[in-house]
From Swiss-Prot:
It comes from the Archaea. It is found in: Cytoplasm. Its main location: cytoplasm. NCBIfam families: aRF1_eRF1. Pfam families: eRF1_1, eRF1_2, eRF1_3. Belongs to the eukaryotic release factor 1 family. This is Peptide chain release factor subunit 1. One of its GO terms (molecular function) is translation release factor activity, codon specific. Directs the termination of nascent peptide synthesis (translation) in response to the termination codons UAA, UAG and UGA.
Amino acid sequence: MSENSSTDMYLFKKSLKELKGKRGKGTELISVYVPAGRRLSDISQHLRQELSQSSNIKSKTTMKNVQSAIEVILQRLKLLKEPLEKGVIIFAGMIPRGGPGTEKMEVYVLEPPEPVKTFIYRCDSEFYTESLEDFIQDTEVYGVILVDRNEATIGTVKGKTITVLKKLTSGVPGKFKAGGQSARRLERLIDDAAHQFMVRIGEYSTESFMPILEEKKLRGLLIGGPGNTKNEFAEKDFLHHELKKKIIDTFDLCYTEEFGIRELLEKASDLLRDLDLMKEKNLIQKFFKELIKDDGGLSAYGESQVMRYLEMGAIDTLIVTEDIELTRVTIKCNNCNFKQEINVKTRDLYKFEDEVKTKICKQCSGSMYIEEEKDIIEYLSELCNIHNSDIVVVSTDTEEGSQISKAFKGMAAILRYKI
């Protein structure tokens, strides 16, 4: 099956993180953003003009590096097929690996998750990644209003992130036992204070959610809390009329602070099953239900077991945490073409590259070299594609995702059949 969108987004985020850490020796790193539908011949013409102007650069080393980067990008553009539905983003430049003389040309070609809108050419000491940040933002937002007689919490749920925007307290006094006119007057004052508190909640909600609604990113409003206060707030005209149209439902809750938002999400899970947070939670809970069975059920976990079962085609859904730091390295013999694939911790990759230079082939004692390095999630995604398995990359921001990361080294799976 086709690669899961969570894998695509993970790889995009990983590339962004790597690019943000790259630095050139001088002003010689090139960033090119090609808008969707733009003719590649126009882009190539612009780059050739930049190539010509680069001859004016005073430093010969910088001039040479800039020209090399532009030429690499021109070559990559020739390999692309039009039309580009989303456009393309290309980065190229000489990146130092250590001291002077260790620079190596690096090139990155990214297909953006959303269409590129504006052409950008930038030559700097670092790659221009600011526009990439917009692509990794979740576009759909749920507004949350938790309310009771004494306090309220206004927040958002965006992808996997819960954000508390405002906490309010009413100052409304509690019930009393006194009777007579004084009691009735006090009761009116309390009712008026409660009404004014609702008005404040409505004003802060409008201030918080209308900008999101105007950007067409507000998917809906969830209103919760103990007692009847939430229903009164939802039914009367405390909210802006456009926001009232976005109310999905009201929910009975025990809490009105951040824990109440989590309680609300649990109760609203059927309505929000498309939300990443709930999809991940439900999937991981399904895995744990299999795991706790006496025979382990249809569960697998850990790098060794998961890799073996995936290659057998026995995995239905592979769960990988986004913090897994492994690279799939293929080393090959210079003499007999013997190959070996190894998972290497990404932080140890440079050390492993040095070790390979002294490695001896097991079959003919020839020298070995690195043929390919690939992010482990990209590699696993390709295997899943071959074996018609699903792959889901989960965040460690959730309790369930953190459990997979810590207890199972970031890899778990639900099997198709018992092994």
